[in-house]
Swiss-Prot record:
EC number(s) from the headed UniProt entry: 1.8.-.-
Protein name: Chloride intracellular channel protein 6
EC supergroup of this enzyme: oxidoreductase
Phosphoserine modified-residue sites: 40, 264, 303, 321, 368
Motif (G-site) on chain: 395-398
Family statement drawn from the similarity comment of this UniProt entry: Belongs to the chloride channel CLIC family.
Species assigned in the record: Rattus norvegicus
Gene name per UniProt: Clic6
Composition bias, Low complexity: 84-96, 208-223
Record key words, sorted: Cell membrane, Chloride, Chloride channel, Cytoplasm, Ion channel, Ion transport, Membrane, Oxidoreductase, Phosphoprotein, Repeat, Transmembrane, Transmembrane helix, Transport, Voltage-gated channel
Subunit structure: Monomer (soluble state). Interacts with dopamine receptors DRD2, DRD3 and DRD4.
Residue span of region Disordered: 1-373
Membrane topology recorded in Swiss-Prot or TrEMBL: Single-pass membrane protein
Transmembrane regions listed in the UniProt entry: 397-417
Compositionally biased spans, kind Polar residues: 120-129
Length: 612
């Protein structure tokens, strides 16, 4: 890249330092003469007589630094000082017009293209007055139509000559997602109130027409990215004029449906900071032909989906909005462009849906994943301690809740409580309450039946399995067995023992009959074989349910204590009960929550008195 050279000539306009750039369209008065001047100063190969045919054209009035008819214009900079790293047309080897200038009263994005064009941030302010205090006015017809038709042909020949010298003109477009290598990125910034020279424009000897400040203040925010890349990449003056923008009657610029606009404030001014506006002009340097308008509009949202900064935008913008320009980093500075409502409205429907899907995955990805897995709860179960004060003691109600939490698959803590030395903090936690009780996210729950209902309602699918029964009869099966056992084991009279034993056997037989009776879903209506004996593992089927968590701990106690103190065992002909117990002993949810046999025997040592 050639070094920047100091301009040899100063602006022939007002001597004051203007604050804005003047833009003249290729078809406007003075355009051909301006091209001639640039060609003579920038490239020796360009013919000098190209602009002579349009010398009689009058310079057009510009509002806010932008052509009223919306044409792509040439930019004349007032600041003769080149920005750092900026190329001058004389040394770059590819002089050309500074195209697609977009101006704003406070902050402006000016896409520029030409030979060796780089990314550049341009800050512009309101234009100054000319020597007479106001800009010369020319009728609109004179601005829109060239007086000499040869001027357009001369401009096209000049452009073709310049393209031959500088290669294919790079496309210039607003691309908020893609940022080129460091070598291709040039950010020229100036303090507020000072102008900057636009890249690719002559640094001296050019004509300029300062603008009245009153007119500049009335101009609304100029559009950003309003022109297609083809218009900014060496399109002919006639094509650029045909695709130009129209102005509203009040001076506001209307954007085409496929063009994105920058959201302006109440006064119509863009409120983005100078360093927040970025212009991408040169990413597609090898692209030599124009792209279709619809294709370009569809490509813009897709670039956001594949951009390298997609993850950085999402971290910084939790709301997941990718509809505006994303933040850019320059050196140690980071800035973010304010989102535009107009930009969101102008985004194509397909692109918007894709962005929405990306936002949903990226911003809410970890959150959605966590939501799918379910919220972790702080659960502590307090159970009765054994005789040693530490191990799990004999308590069918404690084991019932222990099994439910285990089957739910929830993370929980188990604390054994020694009733002989109950800590003061536990007495304050649940005063007057013996285990089992539970704390769920800091809330104390003491009623076993209500705890069971609460856990079934709180810990639900898809993460936590449903433990309720499908057949209501399963909930009441064996509900009288434990009461019959208690009466049997506490009886001390030998003559009454047979009566209590028969009552217990009657209750066990009823339970065995239910376990051997096939459930409705075990019977196949289309099968020729009749199912007379059930083969299910548990009360309600092949999976453990809340009914099993209630009955199995009691059956296990009956089996241990009755044999130890009364020599009573479940009859072998009760195949349903034995199948039920054997399947339960094969499950960790049951065996790992059972107290030791010695603990069970020790608990009934006093209750099971010898018969007299």
């Amino acid at each position: 890249m050639a070094e920047a050279t100091e301009p040899k000539e100063v602006s022939s306009g007002s001597q004051g330092q203007p604050e804005g750039a003047v833009i003249e369209g290729p078809g406007e008065p003075g355009a051909a003469d301006l091209e001639g001047r640039e060609a003579s100063e920038g490239a020796a190969e360009a013919p000098r007589d190209l602009g002579e045919g349009a010398e009689a054209m009058a310079s057009g009035k510009e509002e806010g630094g932008c052509g009223q008819d919306g044409e792509i214009g040439e930019v004349q900079a007032q600041d003769p000082r080149p920005g750092p790293g900026t190329e001058t047309p004389g040394t770059s080897g590819a002089p050309g017009e500074a195209e697609a200038a977009e101006c704003d009263s406070e902050g402006a994005l000016i896409p520029q293209s030409g030979g060796g064009a780089k990314r550049q941030q341009v800050q512009g302010t309101s234009s100054g007055l000319d020597a007479q205090g106001e800009a010369p006015e020319v009728p609109e017809d004179a601005r829109r139509e060239p007086e000499d038709p040869k001027a357009s042909e001369a401009g096209e020949e000049a452009e073709s000559g310049q393209e031959a010298l500088g290669g294919s003109a790079p496309e210039s477009q607003i691309n908020p997602e893609v940022q080129g290598p460091v070598g291709d990125n040039m950010d020229t910034e100036a303090p507020a109130g000072e102008p900057q020279g636009s890249e690719g424009e002559p640094q001296g000897g050019g004509e300029s027409s300062p603008q009245p400040q009153d007119e500049a203040i009335e101009i609304a925010a100029a559009e950003v990215g309003g022109h297609e890349p083809g218009e900014l990449a060496g399109a002919s003056a006639a094509d650029a004029k045909g695709e130009g923008e129209t102005l509203r009657k009040d001076g506001f610029e209307e954007a085409a449906p496929e063009e994105a606009r920058v959201d302006s404030g109440e006064n119509g001014f863009e409120e983005a900071a100078p360093e927040e506006a970025r212009v991408d002009s040169g990413e597609n340097r090898d692209q030599g032909r124009l792209q279709e308008e619809t294709g370009e509009e569809e490509a813009r949202p897709e670039s956001g989906l594949k951009g390298p900064c997609e993850e950085a935008i999402q971290e910084k913008a939790p709301d997941g909005s990718l509809d505006g320009e994303e933040a850019k980093s320059t050196g140690h500075e980071e800035s973010q462009v304010e989102l535009s409502n107009h930009l969101a409205e102008e985004t194509s429907a397909q692109g918007g849906e894709e962005l929405g899907r990306v936002n949903g995955r990226r911003e809410n990805g970890p959150a959605s994943e966590e939501g799918d897995l379910g919220q972790e709860h702080d659960i502590t179960l307090f159970v009765k301690a054994g005789s040693d004060g530490e191990s799990i003691g004999n308590c069918p109600f404690s084991q019932r809740l222990f099994m439910i939490l285990w089957l739910k698959g929830v993370i929980f803590n188990v604390t054994t409580v020694d009733l002989k030395r109950k800590p003061a903090d536990l007495q304050n936690l649940a005063p007057g309450t013996n285990p089992p009780f539970m704390t769920f996210d800091g809330e104390v729950k003491t009623d076993v039946n209500k705890i069971e209902e609460f856990l079934e309602e709180k810990l639900v699918p898809p993460r936590y399995p449903k433990l309720g029964t499908q057949h209501p009869e399963s909930n009441s099966a064996g509900n009288d067995v434990f009461a019959k056992f208690s009466a049997f084991i506490k009886n001390t009279k030998k003559d009454a023992n047979d009566i209590y034993e028969k009552n217990l056997l009657r209750a066990l037989k009823k339970l065995d009959s239910y376990l051997n009776s096939p459930l409705p879903d075990e019977i196949d209506a289309y099968s020729t074989e009749d199912v007379t004996v059930s083969q299910r593992k548990f009360l309600d089927g092949d999976e453990l349910t809340l009914a099993d968590c209630n009955l199995l701990p009691k059956l296990h106690i009956i089996k241990i204590v009755a044999k130890k103190y009364r020599g009573f065992e479940f009859p072998s002909e009760m195949t349903g009960i034995w199948r039920y117990l054997n399947n339960a002993y094969a499950r960790d949810e049951f065996t790992n929550t059972c107290p030791a046999d010695q603990e069970i025997e020790h608990a009934y040592s006093d209750a099971a008195k010898r018969m007299k």
